[in-house]
Amino acid sequence: MARIDYYFTTVSPFVYLAGVRLEDIAARHGAEITYKPVDAQALFARTGGLALPQRHDSRKAYRLQEMARQSRKHGLPINPQPMFWPVNPAPSAYAIISAQTAGGGDLGALVHGFARACWAEDKDISDDAVIRDQLEKAGFDPALSDRGMLSAAESYSVNLEEAVSRGAFGVPFYITGEERFWGQDRLEDLDLHLSGKL
């Protein structure tokens, strides 16, 4: 069985714009996804990237154009300037890590739910009520938002170190075997790779 390690942050517009295509690809190929939320700002700093405020204006403008194009392409509405952004991604990341450990729900729906809440629904995904609601909607015990936070925080740090050591430098980032794919616009390539065509 193929395995896909998925490095992401819940506050990335491009994680949101990936929708559930990764999950669809994994289902087609019988692949297993391991969800690995990371501190994207720390990942950028460690691998030569720049946080959005430090990027050149042309890069910022292109980002907005690309967000609009991908939104239209995939039928996912997006607010390019959400009410609660930037927002601390750690609480939602901890909830995802705890949910993955606990099992019983739909992790893909949980990840997409947090990203959608941020980028399409103007919700504060660091707020406990929002976290509990997203857990419940994805079939998990909402009480996970209060349990296992220390171990989840440790896993969050480990995910960052692992991402750096495995050559990830942005989000979303997908690794299967030795093959790396950066960006939701590379999901088609991941699909072709798993099909043995690329």
Predicted segments with their positions:
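C-terminal cap of thioredoxin/glutaredoxin-like
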Residues: 4-5, 10-31, 109, 113-198
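Structural alpha/beta surface segment adjacent to cysteine/selenocysteine redox centers
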Residues: 10, 17-118
